[in-house]
Amino acid sequence: MAKTSMKAREAKRAQLVAKFAEKRAALKVIIASPASSDEDRWDAVLKLQALPRDSSASRQRNRCNQTGRPHGFLRKFGLSRIKLREATMRGEVPGLRKASW
């Protein structure tokens, strides 16, 4: 089990990403645009740097919904490999079963 503080930190990051997504995207468009002047581009870079670090989507970490485990995470199910296996063995995941050949 992950610490409660780690789960809370990830929730806060998700909230910040959602809050600043539009602003961040608009600044990136200005930076990437060849039509924008050097001054506009530089201002956009400074504004982007002034945003909170945790508002960047790349700082988010996928975690298991049940345990908070960061490794072995399967996006399709939102669970770690361990919890997915347990749920599969109990028959809680429709259409999923242990491989046998």
From Swiss-Prot:
InterPro entries for this protein: Ribosomal_uS14, Ribosomal_uS14_bac/plastid, Ribosomal_uS14_CS
GO MF, one example: rRNA binding
Record key words, sorted: Ribonucleoprotein, Ribosomal protein, RNA-binding, rRNA-binding
Superkingdom, taxonomy of origin: Bacteria
GO biological process, one term: translation
Gene Ontology, cellular component aspect: cytoplasm; small ribosomal subunit
Described function: Binds 16S rRNA, required for the assembly of 30S particles and may also be responsible for determining the conformation of the 16S rRNA at the A site.
Assembly, per entry: Part of the 30S ribosomal subunit. Contacts proteins S3 and S10.
Protein's name in the database: Small ribosomal subunit protein uS14
Organism: Shewanella oneidensis (strain ATCC 700550 / JCM 31522 / CIP 106686 / LMG 19005 / NCIMB 14063 / MR-1)
